[in-house]
């Protein structure tokens, strides 16, 4: 017999640092699954990754108090900030630039994110990444 899904929780957790404190604890606890069991499983799954990378995670909670989770690639904004070397995007995107990125770097990010994006080809994924860069105030150079 298939397990009955009780809730699906979407979180963005930094790799290797899932703790029972907010925001992870309350979101997982309300779903009725053991918080420490999830934290240990998530930290074990992200053990080989660099610390502090934001990981979009979807936790599927079942009626019998068990759970499964899937992790995606970090957001495009994380990759853009890492490539440009900035802490945050521009406060006035379109008016002031906070850095620049090359098309080769955009292609590299698009290839990493291709599986999570709804793009059909690499050019479409590159346009999505360029749009994210533009909305963050990062200029794209050739």
Curated annotation (Swiss-Prot):
This is Large ribosomal subunit protein uL11. The keyword rRNA processing does not apply. One of its GO terms (cellular component) is cytosolic large ribosomal subunit. Part of the ribosomal stalk of the 50S ribosomal subunit. Interacts with L10 and the large rRNA to form the base of the stalk. L10 forms an elongated spine to which L12 dimers bind in a sequential fashion forming a multimeric L10(L12)X complex. One or more lysine residues are methylated. Belongs to the universal ribosomal protein uL11 family. InterPro entries: Ribosomal_uL11 (IPR000911), Ribosomal_uL11_bac-typ (IPR006519), Ribosomal_uL11_C (IPR020783), Ribosomal_uL11_C_sf (IPR036769), Ribosomal_uL11_CS (IPR020785), Ribosomal_uL11_N (IPR020784), Ribosomal_uL11_N_sf (IPR036796). NCBIfam families: L11_bact. Forms part of the ribosomal stalk which helps the ribosome interact with GTP-bound translation factors. One of its GO terms (molecular function) is structural constituent of ribosome. The gene is rplK.
């Amino acid at each position: 017999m298939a397990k009955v899904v009780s809730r699906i929780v979407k979180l963005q957790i930094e790799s290797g640092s899932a703790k029972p404190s907010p925001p992870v604890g309350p979101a997982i606890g309300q779903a009725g699954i053991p918080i420490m069991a999830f934290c240990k499983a998530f930290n074990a799954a992200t053990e080989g990754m660099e610390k502090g990378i934001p990981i979009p995670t979807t936790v599927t909670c079942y009626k019998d108090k068990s759970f499964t989770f899937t992790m995606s690639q970090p957001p495009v904004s994380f990759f853009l900030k890492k490539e440009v070397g900035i802490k945050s995007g521009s406060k006035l995107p379109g008016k002031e630039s906070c850095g620049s990125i090359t098309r080769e770097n955009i292609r590299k990010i698009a290839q990493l994110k291709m599986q999570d994006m709804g793009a059909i080809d690499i050019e479409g994924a590159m346009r999505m990444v360029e749009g994210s860069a533009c909305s963050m105030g990062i200029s794209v150079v050739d």
